[in-house]
A protein has these predicted regions:
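Alpha-helical segments in transporter systems
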Residues: 28-50, 71, 75, 141-151, ...
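Membrane-integrated ABC transporters
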Residues: 1-44, 66, 90-94, 123-159, ...
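Extended non-transmembrane interhelical loops and adjacent amphipathic helices
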Residues: 1-16, 95-142, 204-247, 320-333, ...
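ABC-type nucleotide-binding domain
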Residues: 344-596
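Cytosolic ends of transmembrane helices, especially the final helix of ABC transmembrane type-1 domains
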Residues: 229, 296-331
Length: 596
């Protein structure tokens, strides 16, 4: 019991947190939703409880048409005013407010995502919350206002009808109280049963969802056409459906019984009270008019439904609060990697690794062990080794996407932690192995910022990477839209062409340190040779880190580091390492045989 109360207040606190966020983004949206709910409740009560009873009483008592029309016109004026308020509010407050709120919440999420430690991507529980927050949080926070609208509506309805019934007939209050207690108890039992049924269905539903994805995702399109796996999937889908039917059948009898009891309690309470009112009207005179009979009966019905709805608000608040909590937890998460540096970056970008070791968060396996590197500005460094050697992890530390478990990385004489992370990363430009072409123009894909594009420089970089023949065929030059994400006429490129764009992006920047992870993986040997020499000449005064499996790239490096199992096992120039006849020489000669 105590745990349930704590969970409720926690969910309620989360809802208030979400409402504050929304009010800050669009106060007019919140005010409109609350006022609309209150006015809607009053309008419904006016029509179903008071106006109908008033008209019947006027007819029964022989009142003049003018007398009745005066009050009907007042009611009509109220409804007209409410309609005008609703029409203007929908456009001015509701629709605009939704856009403002979505924009505000999304920008907060994007800003947090950019600043979030990379280590959080390695935590599956946090990553699930992160994905949910990015995809669904704004929608669910807006949906929570539908709950607020409902709460205000039933609260106003319950308050008005409660006062009205209490002042007219105390028996009605007793009838409502008994009805509500039974209905709430039945509802709680039914909800628990439905939750249990949903939990039992979940494994089968998950399997059906997976099969559904297999048939519409592009990733599986070729496999299901070139194999007989579809027969097995059909069989599994039918089996999962039958299992779900079994779960539903198992729980359906009790749920039907509870539903019938709920209906019976409602019917007995309301019809019983109607009999009481009619008895008072025809025999005792305790109810003066037929209009009062209709009015009190409708009021009791509304009061009963409103109080039952308010009782059911508790699980709705808990459920909605859980959704909001995910976004709150995501935005409130503190980075494990502090950004407390205040020093200005030195003129030279000389990087040093001093006895650096590293293990990914949550893992006891050491990925890098006692790494020592000296990378003066302007040097050309190659990191080589087989998959899993630790090359990509090493450059992630260099970019300060992670901090070392032990040892330090220095820029000049200071630990890189002494510098603001954003300032430090501004001087690094990276071509990742899994680089992405953005759904934007070619020019925007090269500049990767919102600053005015230096078109001549962008064209020069594209030319240096050998992209010019493709560029000359483009309909709109640097303004050509890439990918078909937003434009059916968008242009898509081959892997090699896309890689040339990505390399142009790196060269276009003014960064002092360029990190190229497999820069020529999608290129033919001739293009690779030309590109490597072009990069080397163009970035003569900038540091370049090459990560490569194809060792033809490494020949232009000033120094080569061979990694294995997270350790540097060999270092030197290409010629020095060939003379040593170690692992590097063995790897190089094996690759050279492919071109003989």
């Amino acid at each position: 019991m105590l745990k349930g109360i704590k969970e409720f207040f926690k969910s309620f606190d989360n809802m208030l947190w979400g409402y504050k966020k929304v009010f800050k983004a669009s106060p007019e949206y919140v005010i409109y939703k609350v006022l609309h709910a209150a006015l809607s409740a009053l309008q419904d009560l006016l029509l179903s409880v008071f106006l109908l009873a008033f008209v019947l009483s006027c007819i029964e008592q022989g009142k003049s048409f003018g007398y009745a029309a005066k009050y009907i016109l007042i009611a009509a004026a109220f409804m007209t005013a409410k309609f005008i308020f609703e029409s203007i509010g929908t456009q001015k407050c509701l629709n605009r407010g939704i856009e403002k709120i979505t924009r505000s919440l999304s920008l907060q999420l994007y800003d947090k995502a950019i600043k979030m430690d990379m280590s959080f991507y390695d935590d599956p529980n946090f990553y699930n919350d992160f994905v949910w927050a990015m995809n669904d949080a704004p929608t669910h926070i807006l949906l929570s206002f539908d709950l607020l609208h409902w709460i205000v509506y039933v609260a106003v309805s319950a308050a008005v009808t409660g006062v009205y019934v209490a002042t007219q007939d105390a028996v009605g209050v007793i009838a409502v109280a008994v009805s509500v207690v039974f209905r709430v108890v039945l509802h709680v039992i039914a909800v628990k049963k439905e939750v249990k049924m949903a939990e039992e269905k979940k494994p089968f539903q998950r399997k059906r969802d997976y099969i559904n994805r297999v048939f519409y995702l592009n990733d599986f399109a070729k496999d299901i056409r070139l194999s007989n796996i579809k027969d097995m999937l059909f069989k599994d889908f039918k089996a999962s459906s039958r299992d779900m039917e079994g779960v539903i059948k198992k729980h359906s009898k009790l749920l039907v019984f509870l539903s019938q009891c709920y209906y019976a309690v409602t019917t007995v309470a309301l019809n019983g009270y109607l009999v009481w009112l009619l008895y008072g009207y025809f025999f005792t005179g305790s109810v003066a008019t037929l209009g009062m009979v209709v009015s009190l009966h409708n009021a009791i019905s509304r009061l009963s439904n409103s109080l039952t709805s308010l009782a059911n608000v508790l699980p709705a608040i808990q459920r909605t609060g859980l959704y909001v909590e995910k976004m709150r937890r995501f935005l409130d998460t503190k980075n494990l990697m502090p950004d407390e540096g205040t020093k200005e970056l030195p003129e030279r970008f000389d990087v040093k690794f001093k006895n650096v070791s590293f293990a990914y968060p949550g893992s006891e396996k050491t990925v890098l062990k006692d790494i020592n590197l000296d990378i003066p500005q302007g040097s050309k460094i190659a990191l080589v080794g087989y998959n899993g050697a630790g090359k990509s992890t090493l450059v992630k530390l260099m970019m300060r996407l992670y901090d070392p478990t032990s040892g330090e990385i220095a820029l000049g004489d200071d630990n890189i932690k002494e510098f603001p992370v954003e300032d430090y990363r501004e001087h690094i430009s990276t071509l990742f192995q899994d680089f992405q072409i953005m759904a934007a123009t070619l020019g925007e894909n090269i500049s990767m910022n919102d600053q005015p594009l230096d078109e001549e420089r962008a064209k020069e970089m594209l030319d240096l990477t050998g992209f010019t023949p493709v560029y000359n065929r483009l309909p709109n030059g640097l303004n050509t839209r890439l990918t078909k994400e937003f434009d059916d006429e968008g242009t898509s490129f081959s892997g090699g062409e896309s890689q040339k764009i990505a390399i142009s992006r790196v060269l276009y920047s003014d960064a002092k340190l360029l990190i190229l992870d497999e820069p020529s993986a999608a290129l033919d040997p001739l293009s690779e040779y030309t590109l490597n020499h072009t990069i080397n000449e163009l970035a003569a005064d900038r540091t370049i880190i090459f990560i490569s499996h194809r060792l033809s790239t490494t020949r232009i490096a000033d120094k080569i580091y061979m990694l294995e199992n997270g350790q540097i096992i060999e270092e030197g120039t290409h010629d020095e390492l060939i003379e040593k006849k170690g692992k590097y020489a063995e790897m190089f000669l094996l690759q050279a045989q492919k071109y003989r």
